[in-house]
């Protein structure tokens, strides 16, 4: 079903004159790319009108919806969990950002893109000094507290100790630095850090 929807959307994009498209997951690269290849392969070419940038104005819209500390907390937990997996040699990790809470919510496989999105969401709220529905101000102090609380909760729920607990503490400090970097418009990817770089961050002062 998802593949069919993606294929239909990319077919529409190709027919509007776009030569290639963006897809969220590598699994859908073929289904997303085929409409462009097939149309271009048929000899079809976009018209001159389709090349006019004014046909595609950029729209910057602020989405409507509640802003909650709980949402920021879930992103903080996801980020700590992901960085822990990275430190443990995994580029993707099954993460339940609602672990320990009532209800059925299985872990979802998350990768580096999710880590970057969680980092960006938190950093945006800090940069814009967003207040949640209950009036809480998003600043470094709040984010630091959420990272600490979620790390503590992960360790407690998993009854972790020793090396495993230490890895989560290390992940917490790296996550904090990653968020701090984004608020300074430094979008360096986690993949560009060496093990030595990450060790220095973990051994250094708190970023937040």
Predicted regions and their residues:
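Expand to "…catalyze enediolate/carbanion chemistry for C-C bond making/breaking, isomerization
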Residues: 1-208
């Amino acid at each position: 079903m998802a593949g069919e929807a993606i294929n239909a959307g990319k077919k529409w994009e190709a027919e509007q004159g776009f030569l290639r498209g963006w897809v969220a997951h590598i699994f859908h690269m073929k289904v997303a790319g085929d409409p462009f290849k097939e149309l271009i392969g048929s000899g079809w070419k976009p018209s001159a009108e389709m090349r006019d940038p004014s046909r595609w104005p950029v729209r910057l819209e602020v989405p409507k919806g509640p802003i909650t500390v709980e949402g920021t907390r879930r992103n903080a937990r996801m980020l700590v969990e992901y960085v822990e997996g990275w430190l443990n040699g995994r580029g993707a990790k099954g993460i339940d950002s609602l672990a320990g809470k009532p209800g059925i919510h299985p872990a979802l496989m998350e990768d580096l893109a999710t880590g970057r999105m969680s980092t960006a969401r938190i950093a945006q709220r800090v940069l814009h000094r967003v207040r949640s529905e209950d009036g809480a101000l998003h600043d470094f102090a709040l984010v630091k507290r959420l990272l600490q609380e979620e790390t503590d909760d992960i360790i407690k729920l998993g009854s972790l100790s020793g090396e495993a607990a230490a890895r989560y503490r290390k992940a917490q400090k790296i996550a904090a630095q990653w968020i701090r970097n984004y608020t300074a418009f430094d979008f360096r990817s986690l993949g560009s850090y060496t093990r030595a770089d990450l060790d220095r961050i973990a051994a250094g002062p708190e970023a937040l």
